[in-house]
Amino acid sequence: NLVEPNPSKWLLNVPEISLNKNLPDKAAVVVLAVKPQMMKVALKKILKFANTETIFLSIAAGSTIKMFEKELGQSSIIIRAMPNTPASVNKGITAIIGNKLTTEDNLVLSENLLNAVGKTLRLNNEEQMDAVTAISGSGPAYVFYLIESLAKAGEAQGLSPELSMELSRATIVGAGALTELTLELPSQLRVNVTSPGGTTQAALEILMDDKIGLAPLINQVVNAATLRSKHLGKQ
């Protein structure tokens, strides 16, 4: 059963989905995939499953286990997950953490569901979720912007927008595939590409500058996203 107040035209035309129908009396898993500001409203519609053996699996950023236990009861099984958008092409990475009532079987069932769209990792504690959100949850947007910026830089050097974008996209996709398929660390892959006195070294001298390079900038980026995640969790 799928509850969606504003279903898309595509969703309306999928016959296999039971859309906005009466909920069953029992449910093995309830997946919560709504915006954080709408979460409490959504939870009121599924209170019948609270304090039962139903697993509440949330993929909403900033919605804490404490909040779910407050709304659903201390005897509810809560698993919080942070997926990312590459899940839409089965290349996602999802981190999960459960509350004290969560069993190994509950985690395995949730992992089996989430593994359908990529990889799943378990966290040691919920505090890690803010950093996870900043790295893998928001991370795809950083990469997309890198592609944009690389393509714009190519245009500035005289390439056509189409050619520069194709080169940039293929380069990021290829580099990502290489990191996935090789046993070498990204740092070694970087060294493999870098010839002494060559073009890559000239570029890396700027990117790897301790003060104005990419590393300090990325630290600021991840810190900002982590702080925002913590702020959302307190609302």
Where are these regions (language model features)?
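A general structural signal for well-ordered alpha-helical segments in protein cores
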Residues: A27, M39, L43, I65, ...
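Short pre-catalytic strand/loop immediately N-terminal to key active-site residues, enriched for Gly-Thr
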Residues: Q128-A134, P186-V191
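NAD(P)-dependent Rossmann-like dehydrogenase/reductase catalytic/cofactor-binding core
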Residues: R169-Q235
